[in-house]
Amino acid sequence: MRFAWTALLGSLQLCALVRCAPPAASHRQPPREQAAAPGAWRQKIQWENNGQVFSLLSLGSQYQPQRRRDPGATAPGAANATAPQMRTPILLLRNNRTAAARVRTAGPSAAAAGRPRPAARHWFQAGYSTSGAHDAGTSRADNQTAPGEVPTLSNLRPPNRVEVDGMVGDDPYNPYKYTDDNPYYNYYDTYERPRPGSRYRPGYGTGYFQYGLPDLVPDPYYIQASTYVQKMAMYNLRCAAEENCLASSAYRXDVRDYDHRVLLRFPQRVKNQGTSDFLPSRPRYSWEWHSCHQHYHSMDEFSHYDLLDASTQRRVAEGHKASFCLEDTSCDYGYHRRFACTAHTQGLSPGCYDTYNADIDCQWIDITDVKPGNYILKVSVNPSYLVPESDYSNNVVRCEIRYTGHHAYASGCTISPY
């Protein structure tokens, strides 16, 4: 009985090994091709989809942008015949049913069609060789870059593009940035409430994703071109009176709504020509809401206006502090607006202007009590130096004003260090 079981098991094992095994070709994948000779197609990747087997064949894929033809490549002579031959990169995606027949015919023809190209840096190198002799056993080494040769993207990037390792679309000198429709720009709250021991400085967040400092410069020609005198009734100056934009005589008890004030109006345009955003000196949670003008004031004193006597340099009109809503009104070509007059995005980007026309509230000096004569209009931006700048010597504009009692003429507006 024991002999019978042994004989039965032996026959089953022999059947499993010899007779009962199905043809190996029915379950085995198509054999891989042997190592290709130099210049032939090589199988890189093989996969199956919907019952069909696909192969990725290549002589060595690489990307080469269009460049000038090398004059020595087509020059006749023995030297050209012995020059290193670079195989032309071709990348094919074919069905494996017809790939076997085409590989045998396409290999020699593609190798013969290879043309020498000038040596250059390449973005992607796979199976690339600068020599005509290529060992079949080094197909894996072809996919690696030599230690001394570092692939670069220099021939793919737009010219003069600046690398940015900060927040998305943040480089002010990058004309290819996209910030208009980018919801993640300035995603981090740089105006969070400072914690004890924090190293925040005035202008919260300027050192977080920017390099350098801002530099505000007022436009003297903009002021000189649009300075004029206007008379307005007190009932039209209620919001201005609320923000202390008038002389002290306007707040007397005997002043009526139909009394007029004489205003020296002028515009202002401030440019940030630095390398960092000019951000408000106050954190966002302390911004003040002004119901008359329906916006937040993020700085107590962004500008200061004074009227000085031309001979004595004494103040003849009561200047006032102008606290504005900072925003990018316009920008130079290649720059984009990134700040607006809202509750959380106030500031001034590099290469952009914050413009205040002469017809808006508080863009004036109340000269109701000033006599006709020659004066100096002094306009200062960031007068208290609350926000760090790279240069404070260009923050003041001085203009010569000739006031006749009904008209004012501005001339000689220049940047001044004081």
UniProtKB/Swiss-Prot annotation:
Cu cation binds at residues 293, 295, 297. Residues 1-20 form the signal peptide. This is Protein-lysine 6-oxidase. Interacts with MFAP4. Interacts (via propeptide) with EFEMP2; this interaction is strong and facilitates formation of ternary complexes with ELN during elastic fiber assembly; this interaction limits interaction of EFEMP2 with FBLN5. Its EC number is 1.4.3.13. Residues 140-157 have a biased composition (Polar residues). Its cofactor is Cu cation; lysine tyrosylquinone residue. It comes from Bos taurus (Bovine). Residues 72-84 have a biased composition (Low complexity). PANTHER family: LYSYL OXIDASE-LIKE-RELATED, PROTEIN-LYSINE 6-OXIDASE.
